[in-house]
């Protein structure tokens, strides 16, 4: 075990000093599911979706709205908005190459925002946003997630995190896994689920199972 760990440390050191420099890497992903039929039991459907999301959350915020009187013919779609647009704070963030955009959904039946900080000691954090948009023929489930990975460089903590990632990958692989759990939850209450659109980064593939590929089908 000692020899293997030493070899890993040497491998990390020889891979390139640039990869071990202190840095912060942010990557976003999304998937949009279409769920039919519209006659699904609404409460069972929303509960199943919520249960699937909160299993991997450290912190959770849920908003449920009153169903609309008249359903639209086509569902809406999440949008990314800059909360600091046209402000001094926005200009300051832009000058520091920090682009902060948050997902929002209009006329959503339910919105869920979560944070997963269980791997914060290794410089990793995940934010997860989900909204359920009803329409005439069913529902859309829009999911947007952001993964932040901070590299502490050649510090004991940074080296430890790098060794762990080289063995089992980082916690970004739980994002497509949660997306798949949401899909399975919708199917468990009788929903027929299809993917409308998605973007799953290659880096989000699991160490043992390609969760990214299954989330985008």
Where are the regions a protein language model picked out?
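Polybasic, proline/glycine-rich intrinsically disordered low-complexity segments
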Residues: 104, 114, 118, 143, ...
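Bacterial N-terminal signal peptides that target proteins for export
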Residues: 1-6
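Short beta-edge strand/loop motif at the mouth of beta-sheet-based domains
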Residues: 58-98
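Surface-exposed short loop/turn segments
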Residues: 83-147
């Amino acid at each position: 075990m000692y020899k293997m760990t030493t070899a890993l440390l040497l491998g990390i050191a020889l891979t390139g000093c640039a990869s071990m420099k202190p840095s912060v890497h942010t990557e976003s992903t999304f998937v949009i599911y279409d769920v039919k039929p519209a006659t699904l039991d609404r409460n069972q459907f929303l509960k199943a979706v919520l249960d699937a999301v909160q299993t991997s959350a450290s912190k959770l915020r849920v908003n449920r709205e009153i169903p609309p009187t008249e359903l639209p013919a086509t569902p809406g779609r999440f949008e990314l908005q800059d909360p600091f647009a046209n402000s001094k704070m926005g200009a300051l963030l832009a000058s520091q190459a920090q682009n902060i955009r948050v997902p929002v959904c209009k006329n959503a039946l339910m919105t869920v925002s979560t944070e997963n900080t269980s791997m914060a000691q290794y410089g990793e954090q995940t934010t997860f946003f989900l909204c359920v948009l009803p329409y005439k023929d069913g529902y859309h489930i829009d999911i947007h997630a952001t993964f932040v990975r901070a590299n502490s460089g050649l510090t004991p903590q940074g080296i430890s995190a790098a060794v762990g990632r080289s063995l089992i990958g980082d916690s970004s692989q739980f994002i497509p896994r949660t997306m798949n759990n949401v899909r399975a939850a919708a199917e468990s209450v009788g929903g027929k689920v299809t993917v409308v659109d998605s973007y799953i980064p290659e880096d989000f593939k699991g160490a043992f199972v390609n969760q990214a590929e299954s989330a985008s089908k």
